[in-house]
Amino acid sequence: MKKKYRIKKNDDFQKVFRRGKSFANRQFVVYTLKQEGSNHFRIGLSVSKKIGNAVCRNRIKRYIRQSFHELEDQINPENEYIIIARKPAANMDFHEVKKSLIHVLKVGRVLKQKPNNSK
């Protein structure tokens, strides 16, 4: 995922927190805010120091970014997303992280239907 599709600035984070909707499961909280006219979604990641050391936090962020990259064609391109990892995410492998993100995005009705020709 390209860096221009990431949310980095505090003002952008606060805008999504204040105006957006939130959805959660045990591992992740997802805030989403619709941005009219955007041609690609943006994501911001937050992983607290309570979750683990830097290696653990960076691994979780890599897993989340890769999951969004693989789900790119199913995600609404007009939204901005903030993903906050919770403590149970520290012990998960990539496939568990992806499955959990799919679950929370379905709860929020953010994912489009899977194309029939996909694997």
From Swiss-Prot:
Record flagged with keyword ATP-binding: no
Keywords: Endonuclease, Hydrolase, Nuclease, RNA-binding, tRNA processing
Enzyme class: hydrolase
Presence of the UniProt keyword Glycosyltransferase in the record: no
GO molecular function: 3'-tRNA processing endoribonuclease activity; ribonuclease P activity; tRNA binding
Reactions it catalyzes: Endonucleolytic cleavage of RNA, removing 5'-extranucleotides from tRNA precursor
Gene3D superfamilies the UniProt entry points to: 3.30.230.10
PROSITE patterns linked: RIBONUCLEASE_P
Family annotation (Pfam families): Ribonuclease_P
E.C. number: 3.1.26.5
Gene Ontology terms: biological process: tRNA 5'-leader removal
InterPro entries: Ribosomal_Su5_D2-typ_SF (IPR020568), Ribsml_uS5_D2-typ_fold_subgr (IPR014721), RNase_P (IPR000100), RNase_P_CS (IPR020539)
Any one cellular-component term (Gene Ontology): ribonuclease P complex
HAMAP family: RNase_P
Assembly and oligomerization: Consists of a catalytic RNA component (M1 or rnpB) and a protein subunit.
PANTHER family: RIBONUCLEASE P PROTEIN COMPONENT (PTHR33992:SF1)
Biological function: RNaseP catalyzes the removal of the 5'-leader sequence from pre-tRNA to produce the mature 5'-terminus. It can also cleave other RNA substrates such as 4.5S RNA. The protein component plays an auxiliary but essential role in vivo by binding to the 5'-leader sequence and broadening the substrate specificity of the ribozyme.
The family this protein is said to belong to: Belongs to the RnpA family.
Annotated NCBIfam families: rnpA
Protein name as annotated: Ribonuclease P protein component
Organism in which the protein naturally occurs: Listeria welshimeri serovar 6b (strain ATCC 35897 / DSM 20650 / CCUG 15529 / CIP 8149 / NCTC 11857 / SLCC 5334 / V8)
Source lineage: Bacteria, Bacillati, Bacillota, Bacilli, Bacillales
